[in-house]
Amino acid sequence: MMRSFAIVLICYNRIGGIKRLLSSLENVDYDGRTDINLIFSIDNSGTNVVENFAKKYNWPYGPKTIRTFNERQGLKKHILQCGDYTEQYDIVVALEDDIYVSDSMYLYAYQAAEFYEDEDNVAGISLYSFQKNWLKWLLRFEPQHCEYDTYFLKVAQSWGQVWTNKKWKPFKLWLSNNPEFIKDNTIPQALNQWPESSWLKFHDRYCIEKGKYFVYPYVAVSTNCSDAGEHSKKTVTDHQVELMYGKKKYRFSQFSNQAIMYDEFMEREHLGKYLGLSDDELSVCLWGTRPNCTYKRYVLTIDDLPYECVRKFGLFLRPAELNVMRGFEGKDIKLYDTSKARNEHYKNNDFLRYRYSIRSSDYRTLARFSIQMLSLAFGDIKMKIKR
């Protein structure tokens, strides 16, 4: 028996984005189904332009529902209510109005939801695939590929996601017991800085505290057009990624220590065995985003730390952790024993990270890149001063 399937469009007042999203949904391969539920969930923006469009729109793949609100809900409250559609439908795909999907979206979403339905370590399924480090946006994110089509990341997703009741209900229960976001210096600092209107930081926090992961495709079936809206004053292309087209059958990895798995800092997990260490005594900080207050006895990093360096690796293979896994000697990645202090100075080696990430040793290019980094940093400082 086929599971019921709903697509929830999270709408406000951007009619152009809705039309673009619908044009992509019309081209999705629904495997011959004509019972795909399309839900327009429209927050109150003081205008009925989206509602009027939704009423006239003809959805060719099944029933259409329109939900409106008498009062403004705000993004956080609105999306949390959309998640509750998992009480009515077996599988729910949630899409904001600046998202665009590929024709493989349904087949991936359905197969993934079915495969991981009873896996308690999975909190949700992402349609999107990061190509940049979500904590250092100028760095690339390159997960190790394998025979399967997906990997695990301890980061929730809002740029195209799949929920089921078994995944959503535990999160809502946790949220009811944790309604306030308390800042913590052990979590990614971006979460502490996101506005109160963010629902995603709560879902991320849930994954971190409960040790749960999202399933991510290596090649995305959704992309983010980043239209101007509540969180951005202008349209940008920074979040656009390549899309998978024409794929009909996906292979999914079982959740285990042998799977490709990354934590909330986008650092590879379970590297201890390659270093002769227990994972419980190893902190991986290749990208320089892990707070040093979370360091365990051994730290694997590109930075220079004031501790005894017990091993060194090169930075040649991709992804970076593969140099450690294959034992490539060098001088760029260091393993430190924090129980043995040394009279050395800490040195941030972000320049090396960026050189590796942009795949260039051209110092003129790197100089321009450094200027851009400084410009962004000063921009952030100005914004904080204004606040």
Please provide the spans of the model-predicted regions:
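Peripheral/terminal regions associated with large enzymatic or DNA-binding modules
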Residues: 1-95, 99-387
